[in-house]
Amino acid sequence: MYAVFQSGGKQHRVSEGQVVRLEKLEKATGETVEFDSVLMVVNGEDVKIGAPVVTGAKVVAEVVAQGRGDKIKIVKFRRRKHSRKQQGHRQWFTEVKITGIQA
């Protein structure tokens, strides 16, 4: 059984027991999170597709960790001007473990 849900403007395909990295959620470690915007649920041959969401379906997860991703560097380089600008960025994320899919 797996489901596709939306969080942080992105869609994620998950099954029970899977650990997923999402955009930062304002939840503490150990808290339970419910995602109601489930777009599709597949259970063997039974497929439920939402228009736009599946009514009554939700994905339940537990927050495992909060953290920051790898650093990316942004460089603006102007040739022949002896000028460059460098900036770094680390995106916050939340790791959740999927504990249940209810359809």
Swiss-Prot record:
Q: What keywords tag this UniProt record?
A: Ribonucleoprotein, Ribosomal protein, RNA-binding, rRNA-binding
Tell me the Gene Ontology biological-process terms attached to this UniProt entry. translation
Does Isomerase show up as a keyword for this record?
no
**GO CC annotations, alphabetized:** cytoplasm; ribonucleoprotein complex; ribosome
Q: Which InterPro entries match?
A: bL21-like (IPR028909), bL21-like_sf (IPR036164), Ribosomal_bL21 (IPR001787), Ribosomal_bL21_CS (IPR018258)
This entry's Gene Ontology molecular function terms read: rRNA binding; structural constituent of ribosome
- HAMAP family this protein is in? Ribosomal_bL21 (MF_01363)
Function according to Swiss-Prot or TrEMBL: This protein binds to 23S rRNA in the presence of protein L20.
According to the record's subunit comment, the protein's assembly and interactions are: Part of the 50S ribosomal subunit. Contacts protein L20.
What PANTHER family does UniProt report for this protein, alphabetically? 50S RIBOSOMAL PROTEIN L21 (PTHR21349), LARGE RIBOSOMAL SUBUNIT PROTEIN BL21M (PTHR21349:SF0)
Q: Which family does it belong to?
A: Belongs to the bacterial ribosomal protein bL21 family.
Name it: Large ribosomal subunit protein bL21
What would be the name of the gene that encodes this protein? Answer: rplU
